[in-house]
């Protein structure tokens, strides 16, 4: 009888300890960042060799804790939004006002979606994506942008940009920017279809591309 009672007590204690153990909640990334600085790079008719004569701008936006150091690397904590191919009309050289849609069409007022590209057995992101530089570097990651829109309105030297994207993990990505947006002319320095410079230390999650 004593052994039976002892078994009941041990079982009750085990069940109580199990009830108290809760799984760790999923890590939450900032899906509505405020970008405080950025720039646009103009590449002209970058895809003219492929029959698309629309001009292309690459747009980079950063949260205020990210910066570029003396050797040209991105350092700090925060979010980095990169839109590699923003298509504009052949007559435009600055980012015009309007709503831009994530699309593969290559038409004006579209942005190429984020995808995986494989070169020499290495997987790289192309198109539209956001990089998260977290305090815990093990949480730092990159997410592709696969749908949604971006709206840009210019007031003098200030651009107001609002994002309403969908990421490859099905989550929404908002975000806003309101500041001066310098435009850098790369059309002469970068031949059509040539590789464009990126930050060398952009990381990829271990399972990226799988």
Feature-to-residue mapping (PLM):
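A mature extracytoplasmic/lumenal domain signature
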Residues: 87, 156, 165-167
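Bacterial N-terminal signal peptides that target proteins for export
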Residues: 1-8
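Residues at beta-strand starts and edge strands
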Residues: 55, 79, 157-159, 171, ...
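Charge-rich, low-complexity N-terminal segments
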Residues: 20-58
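C-terminal motif of bacterial Sec signal peptides marking the signal peptidase cleavage site
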Residues: 16-17
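Surface-exposed helix/loop patches within compact recognition domains
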Residues: 25, 49-153, 209
């Amino acid at each position: 009888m004593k052994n039976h009672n002892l078994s009941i007590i041990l079982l009750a204690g085990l069940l109580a300890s199990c009830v108290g153990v809760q799984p760790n909640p999923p890590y939450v990334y900032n899906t509505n960042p405020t970008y405080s600085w950025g720039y646009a790079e103009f590449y002209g008719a970058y895809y003219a060799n492929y029959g698309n004569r629309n001009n292309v701008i690459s747009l980079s936006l950063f949260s205020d804790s990210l910066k570029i150091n003396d050797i040209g690397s991105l350092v700090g904590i925060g979010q980095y939004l990169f839109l590699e191919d923003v298509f504009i009309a052949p007559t435009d050289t600055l980012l015009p006002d309007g709503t831009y849609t994530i699309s593969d069409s290559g038409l004006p007022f579209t942005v190429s979606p984020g995808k995986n590209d494989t070169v020499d057995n290495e997987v790289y992101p192309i198109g539209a994506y956001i990089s998260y530089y977290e305090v815990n570097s093990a949480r730092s990651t990159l997410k592709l942008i696969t749908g949604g829109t971006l709206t840009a309105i210019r007031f003098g030297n200030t651009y107001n940009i609002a994002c309403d994207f969908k990421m490859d993990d099905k989550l929404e990505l908002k975000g806003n920017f309101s500041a001066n947006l310098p435009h850098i002319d790369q059309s002469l320095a970068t031949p059509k279809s040539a590789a464009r410079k990126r930050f060398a230390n952009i990381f990829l999650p271990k399972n990226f591309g799988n």
